[in-house]
């Protein structure tokens, strides 16, 4: 790959949260029918230390088709206990009216400003919650959504668009642009087949196109999108079945 991507690190700490996305295929949700189950606090035995980082959110993927993606929280603050406390399935407890919990296949999670964004892949939606209270703020419908990136007050969400199905004629993928104030989709750009992770570098959005549904004819490109025009400028040929795309520290 001839193109080199240089990036200045973003040192801003959104509300002093540290965020971890843990994709645990075997995790189960804690709701049976419409019954709301309280979160399950567990004392880790480790002493909590006051600092900038007050906690970690963990998104559990669950098995495809089970509709049991869950959200956990590791409380590092020491506000409610001398020890670090791990809370399982807090989204169900904080949002008792959401009878289906988070949905089917938690795929990505990030904090932007005061909001927690969660990509629920096979439920074709992005759930947005308050980062402090974990109470639901909005639901954004995105078909077969995959990953998130943020820049300048907008969320950029990659989407396979096509239904989950291994077929050569699967639709080409897209990136959706969402206003983080109104929580509305404001634009969309077509990219390669089955786009996955994406990264913002110097006004450009780089998108890894996997072509995962088109085995053995995988995609092998990175789409480069100009964020001012929100148009695809070009594709960079890299390698088959790409997945991750990260900005380096330069």
PLM features per residue range, with description:
Residues 1-2, 31:
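N-terminal hydrophobic targeting signals that begin at the initiator methionine
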Residues 25-29:
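C-terminal motif of bacterial Sec signal peptides marking the signal peptidase cleavage site
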Residues 2-17:
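Bacterial N-terminal signal peptides that target proteins for export
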Residues 19-23:
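Hydrophobic helical h-region of N-terminal Sec-dependent signal peptides
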Residues 31-250:
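Predominantly soluble domains enriched in secretory-pathway, periplasmic, or organellar proteins
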């Amino acid at each position: 790959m001839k193109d080199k991507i240089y990036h200045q690190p973003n040192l801003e700490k959104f509300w002093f949260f540290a965020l971890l996305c843990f994709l645990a295929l075997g995790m189960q949700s804690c709701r049976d029918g419409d019954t709301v189950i309280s979160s399950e606090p567990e004392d880790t035995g480790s002493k909590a230390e006051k600092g900038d980082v007050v906690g970690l959110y963990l998104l559990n993927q669950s098995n495809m088709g089970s509709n049991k993606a869950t959200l956990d929280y590791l409380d590092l603050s020491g506000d409610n206990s001398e020890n670090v406390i791990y809370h399982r399935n807090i989204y169900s407890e904080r949002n008792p009216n959401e009878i289906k919990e988070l949905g089917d296949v938690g795929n990505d999670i990030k904090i932007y400003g005061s909001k927690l964004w969660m990509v629920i892949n096979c439920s074709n939606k992005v759930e947005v919650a308050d980062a402090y209270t974990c109470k639901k703020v909005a639901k954004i419908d995105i078909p077969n959504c995959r990953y998130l990136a943020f820049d300048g007050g907008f969320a950029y969400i990659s989407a396979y668009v096509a239904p989950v199905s291994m077929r050569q004629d699967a639709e080409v993928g897209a990136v959706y642009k969402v206003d983080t104030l109104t929580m509305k989709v404001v634009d969309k750009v077509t990219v390669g087949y089955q786009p996955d992770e994406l990264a913002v570098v110097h006004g450009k959005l780089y998108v890894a196109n996997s072509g995962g549904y088109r085995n053995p004819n995988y995609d092998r490109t990175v789409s480069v999108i100009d964020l001012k025009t929100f148009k695809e400028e070009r594709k960079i040929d890299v390698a088959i079945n790409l997945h991750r795309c990260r900005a380096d520290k330069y």
